[in-house]
Amino acid sequence: MELEVRHLRALCAIADAGSLHRAARRLGVAQPTLSTQLTRIEQALGGPLFTRERTGCRPTPLGRTVLGRARPLLTDMNTLVREARAAAAGGDSRLRVGSTASRALAGWLRRLRRPGLEPTLQMDVSANALLRRVTDGQLDVAFVHEVEGCALHIPEDLRLRVLVEREPQFVMLPADHPAAARPVVRLADLADDRWMVDPTVDGEWDGVHRMLRAVGLNPRVLHGDYHTAASLVATGEVVTVCQPSSQSRPDTAVRRLYGDPLGVRLLLAGTRAELDAVFPALEDAYWEAARQSTAYREWLEGGGIRTLPRCPVAATGGGRVSCGRAEGSRSRRPRDVAPPRPIG
């Protein structure tokens, strides 16, 4: 059997997912099919590439060597396809943007649009899914958020720009809720409320659960997407975490949580050239949206740090990167960050 590009993609998917089950789901194939394919690849290369354990799969020394060569090859192949498609389009370049939900999106796309460049948008609640699409050549850049304490699976061949190191998450509650009368809400004030979270958003459930558990709360939790949550907040059924750039409405109130107990890191992922080209527009669009939110603007003016900090990236294993909270002033020239490559 000769190795093909699809085989290399399968190996990288297994390494990034950490298990055959999760990798098969991401690739859209049955697990037995992927397992059979892996066995054939290992036979062709002369040895096992992963150790199978109850908790998942880990690359063997041979596997790390193969993955170290496979990832650059996939990057080059994706670049070849992207450049060929652009040339075939006669120079009418399309910038393929992926993003999780953000109020900065409209302003960002507006700033990117110009003669000869038409941005397209793919939305997904899963940041990990968007990052994989960039690696696979389906997207050029992806704007994602990483919930504090819930590291994303960031492929080694992506480069990152940190837009905001720690964006505090606020709470949306009914406008007539007693706690809405104050500009800052304590979690204890919401002890009797039901919460709604979206379990399909990478890290959201874990982050909210950890935040509530830290203050001794174990509230009733419903599952639903953001639009469902906003509707139920308006009718007084639930409260929910929200982006600080969210705006209050006549029937809902957006308030800061005391102590800012939950934060996310905002990242732009892509190739270096693409990041350099589109990051300034994203930066401007984000702070424009921030100023339009009364609650976020007051937080910033009251001492919240408008920061695009520098933070070294540390390997945590499994193709992940994590970064601690950073303090500092906002920089106009953020450094791009490359995830560490495995040794071997």
Swiss-Prot record:
Keywords: Activator, DNA-binding, Transcription, Transcription regulation. One of its GO terms (cellular component) is protein-DNA complex. InterPro entries: LysR_subst-bd (IPR005119), Tscrpt_reg_HTH_LysR (IPR000847), WH-like_DNA-bd_sf (IPR036388), WH_DNA-bd_sf (IPR036390). It holds the Pfam family HTH_1. PROSITE patterns: HTH_LYSR. Residues 1-60 form the HTH lysR-type domain. Disulfide bonds: none annotated. Residues 327-338 have a biased composition (Basic and acidic residues). Residues 20-39 bind DNA. One of its GO terms (molecular function) is DNA-binding transcription factor activity. Residues 322-344 are annotated as: Disordered. Belongs to the LysR transcriptional regulatory family. Transcriptional activator of the gene (snpA) for the small neutral protease. This is Small neutral protease regulatory protein. It comes from Streptomyces lividans.
